[in-house]
């Protein structure tokens, strides 16, 4: 995010020092992926949507975040059999964090309200628009 100009809107939300952001992200994903509940132990329930209210999270920021996340997974050569299920769930969470009304854009859907895989073609298009083409190739037209 810090090195890629295409993630500028996302980067600007985070301030100069990324140390605490990195730490919280690590702690959150530690628990979310089945490891120690580091985030919960320090901060309580994640309540992701509520924690993101202070930030203007729109479709562009959501797209930059998921593309940046997917790019990192691609650069780390994470196997698609692991990466794709994680990405589709993370995309659903990222969409749920949107808090800006935008003309012509449907409001966010709670992550558990619909099978997230129905949105895989949409996610593939988003990733492709950022040059991240390692995942969801079966949805490429």
Where are these regions (language model features)?
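Core of compact, soluble alpha-helical bundle domains
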Residues: 1-141
